[in-house]
Amino acid sequence: MASNFKFKLLSQLKKRAEGGFTLIELLVVVIIIGVLAAIALPNLLGQVGKARESEAKSTIGALNRAQQGYFTEKGTFATDTETLEVPAPDGNFFSFAVNTADNTEAIQDATALNWEADGTRSMSGGTFYDSGTRAFSTVVCRAEAGSEDTPPTPGGANDCGGAEVIK
């Protein structure tokens, strides 16, 4: 009787060793992976939008510096990006334009083309010249998150008219 019991016990242990996961175990693993993916995906998409904004911020900064150089040589601000010869990104996410008000300021805009889908915000930069002190000042502004695609308008150094000052 004892040998029969040993045989049944060993055969039962062998079956368990050869068996795979139960359906419940597999479902629990799938649910855990789904929850982790649901948490990580929005964070990942937010990082992609931030990377695209970083490219626009760099271009606006380059346009601000180019405006300073152009003004130093010509005595006036440039009216378009082609004159400044700053290589702009390919234009899939932002449209870059220069809006010159007068000989004391130049506003450069980076308008988000598809801000809702891309997770990007419009930006603008301002280059200001003070003829009294003969000094330049610059600012880079970013629109609020979830706002429309219109770039903020800088009102002077460190003034973005209610939008976020990022430089």
What does each model-found stretch correspond to?
Residues 1-21:
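N-terminal leader/signal peptides at the extreme start of proteins
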Residues 72-167:
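Periplasmic/extracellular, small/polar-rich flexible segments of pilin-like filament-forming proteins
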Residues 15-47:
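N-terminal single-pass transmembrane signal-anchor helix
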